[in-house]
Amino acid sequence: MSFNLRGAVLANVSGNTQDQLQETIVDAIQSGEEKMLPGLGVLFEVIWKNADENEKHEMLETLEQGLKK
């Protein structure tokens, strides 16, 4: 039996408001649980696919700077 994690995450947050999405993201990060990482990855994938080139560049700069700390 195959489990579609991407589909499950998207179904779970589909239709959420910005506040609900923020709560989901903050909760996942603050919990520090490894099991939350795939869900955050799916959300990042949505952001990346919907970002223009300038937004992608800005995200990469932010990521690069964050990894230097």
From Swiss-Prot:
Subcellular location: Spore core
InterPro entries linked to this entry: SspI (IPR017525)
One Pfam match: SSPI
Induction: Expressed only in the forespore compartment of sporulating cells.
Single GO BP term: asexual sporulation
Record's keyword terms, sorted: Sporulation
Chief location: other
Family: Belongs to the SspI family.
Name the UniProt record assigns to this protein: Small, acid-soluble spore protein I
Species of provenance: Bacillus anthracis
Species lineage: Bacteria, Bacillati, Bacillota, Bacilli, Bacillales
